[in-house]
C-alpha cells in the first residue's frame, strides 16, 4: 500500500525545494507558470529561433510556461498549444486542452487552428507519467517525441517550413543516439543541450533541430 506518511514527506521536500530553488523563485517573480520557462528562454538566447513573427506550436504545453515565453517573444506571430490536460487560457495563445495528438479528430482541429499557416517552430516539453523505471521512462519519452516528429515529417498534419525548428525534451538513455540519427535525416543541424535550469541530478536533455529538409 501507498504510505501516507511517505507521501507527506515527499510533498514537504517538494515544497521546501520549490521555496529555495532559484528558477522556481524567478518563475514566481516573472509570473511564469513553471520554472521550465527559463529552459526555453536560455535555449532561445543560444540559438535565437523565436522571431517576432514566428508561428509556433507547443505539443504537450501544460501548464503553459513555454507558451507564455512564445507569446512574449513572438508578438506578431501565432502561438498554439495542445495538451491532454486542461490548460488555463493565456492571452495571445490558441490552446487545445484535453486533446490527444494521436486522435484523428484532434489532428483535424490542429489543422483548422493553423488555418493553412506554415509552422516555423515545433516545441515539445512533455513527458509521460513516470513508472519508476528509468529505462522504461526514457523509451516512452523518446516515443512521444517521435510521435510529434511524425506529425510534420511523415503525416504532414503540421506543415513545418523549410529550415524550420523542432525542439524536444528527452531523458538520456540507450535510444538517444538512434533518435538523433532519425532527426539528422530531416534536419541539417541537431544539437543536444542541457539548460542551467535543468536540475543537476536530472537526465533531462533537449534536442534542438534546425533547418528542416522538405
From Swiss-Prot:
Annotated positions binding S-adenosyl-L-methionine: 63-66, 83, 100-101, 125
GO cellular component, one term: mitochondrion
Main location: mitochondrion
Known EC number: 2.1.1.-
BP GO terms, sorted: RNA methylation
Pfam family, one: FtsJ
Any one GO molecular function term: rRNA (uridine-2'-O-)-methyltransferase activity
The UniProt record lists the keyword Methyltransferase: yes
Family matches, as InterPro entries: RNA_methyltr_RlmE, RNA_MeTrfase_FtsJ_dom, rRNA-MeTfrase_E, SAM-dependent_MTases_sf
Catalytic activity from the UniProt record: a uridine in rRNA + S-adenosyl-L-methionine = a 2'-O-methyluridine in rRNA + S-adenosyl-L-homocysteine + H(+)
Cytoplasm listed as a keyword: no
Described function: S-adenosyl-L-methionine-dependent 2'-O-ribose methyltransferase that catalyzes the formation of 2'-O-methyluridine at position 808 (Um808) in the mitochondrial large subunit ribosomal RNA (mtLSU rRNA), a universally conserved modification in the peptidyl transferase domain of the mtLSU rRNA. This activity may require prior 2'-O-methylguanosine modification at position 809 (Gm809) by MRM3. Essential for late-stage assembly of mtLSU required for efficient translation of mitochondrial DNA encoded proteins; methyltransferase activity is not required for this function.
Family of this protein: Belongs to the class I-like SAM-binding methyltransferase superfamily. RNA methyltransferase RlmE family.
Official protein name in the record: rRNA methyltransferase 2, mitochondrial
Species whose genome carries this gene: Caenorhabditis elegans
Lineage: Eukaryota, Metazoa, Ecdysozoa, Nematoda, Chromadorea
Amino acid at each position: 500500500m501507498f504510505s501516507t506518511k511517505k507521501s507527506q514527506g515527499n510533498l514537504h521536500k517538494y515544497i521546501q525545494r520549490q521555496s529555495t530553488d532559484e528558477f522556481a523563485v524567478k518563475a514566481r517573480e516573472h509570473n511564469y507558470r513553471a520554472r521550465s520557462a527559463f529552459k526555453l528562454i536560455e535555449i532561445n538566447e543560444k540559438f535565437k529561433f523565436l522571431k517576432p513573427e514566428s508561428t509556433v506550436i507547443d505539443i504537450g504545453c501544460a501548464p503553459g510556461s513555454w507558451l507564455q515565453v512564445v507569446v512574449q517573444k513572438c508578438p506578431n506571430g501565432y502561438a498554439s498549444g495542445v495538451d491532454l490536460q486542461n490548460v488555463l487560457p493565456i492571452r495571445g495563445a490558441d490552446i487545445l486542452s484535453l486533446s490527444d495528438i494521436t486522435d484523428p479528430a484532434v489532428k483535424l482541429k490542429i489543422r483548422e487552428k493553423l488555418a493553412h499557416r506554415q509552422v516555423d517552430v515545433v516545441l515539445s516539453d512533455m513527458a509521460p507519467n513516470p513508472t519508476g523505471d528509468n529505462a522504461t521512462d526514457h523509451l516512452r519519452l523518446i516515443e512521444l517525441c517521435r510521435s510529434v516528429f511524425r506529425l510534420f515529417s511523415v503525416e504532414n498534419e503540421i506543415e513545418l517550413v523549410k529550415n524550420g525548428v523542432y525542439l524536444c525534451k528527452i531523458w538520456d538513455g540507450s535510444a538517444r543516439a538512434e533518435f538523433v540519427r532519425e532527426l539528422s535525416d530531416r534536419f541539417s543541424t541537431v544539437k543536444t543541450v542541457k539548460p542551467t535550469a535543468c536540475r543537476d541530478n536530472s537526465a533531462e536533455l533537449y534536442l534542438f533541430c534546425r533547418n528542416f529538409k522538405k
